[in-house]
Regions:
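Single conserved hydrophobic/aromatic residue that forms the stacking wall/gate
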Residues: 1-8, 12
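Nucleotide-sugar donor-binding and catalytic loop/hinge architecture
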Residues: 71-87, 114-117, 289
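Conserved donor-binding/catalytic core segment of Leloir-type glycosyltransferases
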Residues: 81-100, 106-110, 122-124
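Nucleotide-activated donor-binding/catalytic signature segment of Leloir-type glycosyltransferases, i.e.
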Residues: 134-163
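Aromatic "clamp/platform" in nucleotide-sugar-dependent glycosyltransferases that forms part
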Residues: 176
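A short, well-ordered alpha-helix in the C-terminal region of glycosyltransferases
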Residues: 240-243, 247, 254-268, 285
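C-terminal alpha-helical cap of glycosyltransferases
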Residues: 272-290
Length: 290
């Protein structure tokens, strides 16, 4: 057994694929880092965080986005009003509402479009809200009385999620931090304009030319996220997000140009073949070195 273990340790590498949403890696992870040979991450943001705590090899492979089929559901199947310019934000309460920051999306929408304007619509697609009743009530209190805002809290099939993304016009994420931001990338791959906080992992694929990046201030997390001692995150400027929402709704050519750039760039940067080749290249190097 000792001989087999020794031989295996000479040939095999133990690699961990980790995600994290803040610039500071939790101290509770340090022991686990010691047990692996190298780390795989999906963004430069995560890579930078790990480089502060380890000198082990880090391979960066952005998450691939493939041309997945959706379920074929249409706007009416989701209760979306016909002919209204529709914004979408989706999140899971398990991912910590303070980080996802849905309240900022509501505030930006209502600042952008006073109540007298009824040609716009906002969908907040959440899941697991029933497990966080206090936070769910706070969100409901923001949207009550505004018939233009639709809050759907349910777990639906991934193919239905893709259909909902297709049915909406713009995706908005005023997150305080993201390790990568897969939902943003998925919407961009569909040619949807995306408005998002210009900080953290989504900068792996979002630029000033293929999306609308919202400026922010960095502020202490102050205990609003697990294992966040000493960390900071972004506070997006809601007024600037409101300006972006208004412009995309009122300027179809601008929205189309942003969406086309998004589709093109994500199709190149996050192509499945590109991720596969990076992994194969690293695997070949490990085998050659052994």
């Amino acid at each position: 057994t000792q001989g087999v273990s020794s031989a295996a340790s000479d040939v095999y590498k133990r690699q961990a694929c980790w995600f994290w949403e803040l610039e500071v890696i939790p101290s509770t992870w340090l022991r686990a880092i010691e047990l692996v040979d190298e780390i795989m991450v999906a963004s430069q943001f995560i890579e930078s965080a790990f480089r502060h705590v380890t000198d082990k090899p880090i391979m960066r492979v952005p998450l691939p986005v493939s041309d997945l089929r959706d379920s074929g559901l249409q706007r009416e199947d989701f209760g979306l009003p016909a002919g209204k310019f529709t914004f979408l934000f989706s999140f899971d309460f398990h991912s910590v509402a303070a980080r996802k920051n849905p309240q900022a999306v509501v505030h930006a929408f209502q600042q952008a479009f006073p109540n007298k304007r009824d040609d716009v619509h906002l969908v907040l697609k959440s899941s697991n809200g029933h497990m966080y009743p206090e936070q769910m009530r706070e969100l409901l209190a923001l949207v009550v009385g505004d018939a233009r805002i639709q809050l759907r809290d349910e777990v639906i099939d991934k193919m239905h999620v893709r259909a909902l993304q297709r049915c909406c016009d713009v995706y908005v994420s005023l997150h305080r931090a993201e390790g990568f931001g897969l939902g943003l990338a998925e919407c961009m791959s569909l040619g949807k304009p995306v408005i998002a906080t210009g900080w953290s992992g989504n900068r792996e694929f979002m630029t000033e030319s293929n999306s609308v990046l919202v400026p922010y201030d960095l502020v202490p997390v102050a205990g609003r996220y697990p294992e966040s001692e000493g960390a900071q995150w972004a506070e997006p400027k809601v007024a600037r997000a409101a300006d972006a929402m208004r412009r995309l709704a009122d300027d179809p050519e601008y929205a189309r140009a942003i969406g086309e750039a998004a589709r093109r760039d994500v199709g190149l940067k996050l192509a499945p073949d590109r991720a596969a080749q990076a992994i194969l290249f690293r695997t070949a190097n490990v085998l050659a070195a052994s």
